[in-house]
């Protein structure tokens, strides 16, 4: 990776961070393709808190605790939140936060108004590549792809807007009929 390429990709990452920060609390809709599996979902972010809805599952987090609700199995799993995780399906509060020295970055492709960056963790324990596609004009993230060995998860961000209502929060009273498994 050349220093010039790294500077350019870091400038794009800063622009993405500024775009997302300017939204404040926000809602996103997305589609996911992982092998033969295709689905759509949505998530909301307010500071370190988030709420994700995909198929018959919901995930709530207050930034410290993660509550995974499986409506099909009528089960709630409770665990500590991994605040360092940057996977959009695990911690959308940090899924576009790559500014700094934790990830090496370079411009991978450019097509029209889109620019795709290749991101690779500097920590060798964190394997895999991340491809982040953003609008070069305004910094809006459009797509994020996670590649680990033969596995590939593609997430297209179909909408990203400032949140207008109250953030959904986990309420144990809604799940009295569910089995609750606490891993904390």
Predicted regions and their residues:
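Non-transmembrane domains of secretory- and envelope-associated proteins
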Residues: 2-6, 111-115, 121-129, 136-184
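N-terminal mature ectodomain segment of secretory-pathway/periplasmic proteins
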Residues: 8-68
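Short acidic, glycine-rich loop/turn motifs
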Residues: 30-35, 70, 121-123, 146-148
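Short, surface-exposed charged micro-motifs
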Residues: 40-42, 57-58, 107, 129-133
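An acidic-aromatic
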Residues: 42-90, 148-153
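Short, solvent-exposed coil/turn segments at beta-strand boundaries
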Residues: 43-51, 60-66, 111-113, 134-141, ...
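Generic recognition of long tandem-repeat/solenoid scaffolds
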Residues: 52, 68, 115-121
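Flexible, surface-exposed loop/linker segments and immediately adjacent secondary-structure boundaries
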Residues: 81-113
């Amino acid at each position: 990776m050349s220093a010039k390429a790294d500077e350019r990709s870091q400038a794009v990452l800063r622009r993405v961070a500024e775009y997302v920060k300017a939204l404040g609390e926000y809602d996103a809709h997305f589609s996911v393709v992982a092998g033969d599996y295709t689905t759509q979902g949505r998530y909301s972010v307010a500071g370190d808190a988030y709420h994700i809805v995909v198929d018959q599952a919901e995930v709530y987090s207050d930034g410290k605790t993660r509550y995974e609700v499986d409506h099909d199995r009528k089960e709630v799993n409770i665990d500590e939140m991994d605040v360092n995780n940057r996977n959009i399906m695990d911690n959308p509060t940090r899924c576009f936060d790559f500014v700094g020295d934790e990830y090496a970055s370079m411009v991978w492709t450019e097509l029209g108004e889109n620019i795709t960056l290749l991101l690779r963790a500097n920590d060798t324990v964190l394997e895999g590549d991340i491809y982040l596609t953003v609008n070069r004009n305004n910094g809006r993230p459009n797509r994020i792809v996670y590649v680990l060995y033969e596995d590939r998860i593609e997430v297209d961000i179909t909408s990203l807007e400032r949140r207008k209502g109250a953030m959904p929060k986990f309420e144990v009273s809604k799940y009295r009929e569910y089995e609750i498994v606490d891993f904390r």
